Amino acid sequence: MRTLTILTAVLLVALQAKAEPLQAEDDPLQAKAYEADAQEQRGANDQDFAVSFAEDASSSLRALGSTRAFTCHCRRSCYSTEYSYGTCTVMGINHRFCCL
């Protein structure tokens, strides 16, 4: 029984040692795939649409007496100068409705 346990441990260590170099080789590929995905997401953000409205913004904004026009975009995340006023769906993916 001890022999079986030792052989199993040696086999697992050998498999783990063989798997680590494969994982190291995959890291550059994963980094390239991540970069490509990030560029696609940036491209998708370039396809945002803008919505402008002056008085129909929301009741809380009207209560503040704001009369300036708002520009809103549907994005994955809002910029630091924008506020999230809910969600919107673009091509079946939910995003934030960000207004300036």
From Swiss-Prot:
Keywords: Antibiotic, Antimicrobial, Cytoplasmic vesicle, Defensin, Disulfide bond, Fungicide, Immunity, Innate immunity, Secreted, Signal. Proteolytically cleaved by trypsin at Arg-68; the propeptide is stored in the tissue of the small intestine and the mature peptide is found in the luminal fluid; cleavage may occur during or after release into the lumen. The N-terminal propeptide region suppresses self-assembly and renders DEFA6 propeptide unable to agglutinate bacteria and protect human epithelial cells from bacterial invasion. Changing residue 90 to T: Perturbs self-assembly to fibrils and reduces agglutination of bacteria. Residues 1-19 form the signal peptide. It is found in: Secreted; Cytoplasmic vesicle, Secretory vesicle. GO terms for cellular component: extracellular region; extracellular space; Golgi lumen; transport vesicle. The keyword Signal applies. This is Defensin-6. It comes from the Eukaryota. Belongs to the alpha-defensin family. Changing residue 93 to T: Perturbs self-assembly to fibrils and reduces agglutination of bacteria. PANTHER family: ALPHA-DEFENSIN 1, DEFENSIN-6. Pfam families: Defensin_1, Defensin_propep.
